[in-house]
């Protein structure tokens, strides 16, 4: 793997974009359930998914092709949801099937969506 300032920067920005996506997902969810949009509340809801995201990045070595929809985006998305839900189950937080479905759909749109847009822009550029 070639490491250069450009590839390191791209990976860092991609990881940051993924973090922002998780925070957007959590904020939308908290708002739709009339829960407070506080730093503490968002952090409490987000941390299992952020842990899943980080683990998925490490397990799948997402920094190698951080902007690719496949396989990176798909594996990061699936890992984020699976690990995040596993952590939530482990701490006694909700993992109702409807929540798993909504979380899966919304995070897919966000985590795969920004990558698809980036790929399209890169092809045009």
Set out the residue ranges of the language-model regions.
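Membrane-water interface at the C-terminal end of transmembrane alpha helices
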Residues: 9, 13, 108-125
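Membrane-helix boundary connector in multi-pass membrane proteins
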Residues: 86-102
């Amino acid at each position: 793997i070639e490491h250069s300032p450009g590839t390191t920067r791209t990976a860092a920005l991609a990881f940051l974009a993924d973090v922002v996506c998780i925070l957007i997902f959590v904020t939308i969810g908290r708002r739709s359930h009339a829960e407070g949009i506080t730093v503490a509340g968002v952090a409490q809801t987000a941390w299992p998914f952020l842990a899943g995201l980080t683990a998925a990045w490490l397990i799948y070595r997402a920094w190698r092709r951080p902007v690719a929809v496949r396989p990176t985006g798909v594996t990061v998305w699936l890992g984020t949801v699976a690990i995040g839900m596993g952590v939530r189950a482990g701490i006694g937080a909700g993992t109702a099937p409807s929540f798993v479905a909504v979380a899966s759909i919304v995070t897919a749109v966000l985590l795969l969506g920004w990558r698809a847009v980036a790929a399209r822009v890169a092809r045009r550029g």
